[in-house]
Amino acid sequence: LSELAIHTEKLTKQFGNVLVVNEVDLKIPKGHIYGFLGPNGSGKSTMIRMLCGVLEPTSGKGTVLGYDVKAEPERIKQKIGYMSQKFSLYEELTVKENLEFYSGIYGLKGQESKDRQNELIELAGLVGREEQCSGSLSGGWKQRLALCCALLHRPELLILDEPTAGVDPVSRRIFWDIITQLAKEGVTVLVTTHYMDEAELCNEIGFIFFGNILIKGQPEELIKAHHVQNLDDLFINLVEQQDHNPLKGGSLTYV
């Protein structure tokens, strides 16, 4: 299990009688890219919040980088990098000022801080834009800057919640080139996405629907096993099956 970055068993989150995440089992090896797919309201973000140590599970158990999601949430927060769909940096600050600010938050100082900032600026292709106001950046550049800030403290696990939503195809491709490079360097990546071309770049994917993992595995193997042409067809079939055979929850309401 020491080779697993994320390991959950029957991890569940319930708000009142509303079941949002239902007994999810995950085993994500270190250095892998795991894609979490599903429609809006399927439970992806709730699952991520539990794994980040922000939201306590109702039941079940899980570890992130060896730390218990219930007992050691603060240790988890120190070890991971998180990036949301919404640009959450300071738009009135320049690229360099944002990096310096977040570097200070993570406790980086002096030459170590400067070296890490320069390393990430080069990785993200932001060289020459250091003095540009962050608010004037395009969507793709903003996301690359946000990724840099999430990587400053060299996290072992990077959690990305729909990082390329609303970003043009070229910028999405460049962003994923960076993610792939990080995985090669040993960083584990958990990413949620609506884009099937991005899902195909993952080592493994899981499709969540009404809080349940309907299917998981390697993209190519899933396509072959279900005799479909691509992931789009596979997930359309899954949703149609659920429409005809909705999940039962007794007195619980699934959202």
Residue ranges and their predicted role:
Residues 100, 104, 109-129:
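Conserved ABC ATPase "signature" region
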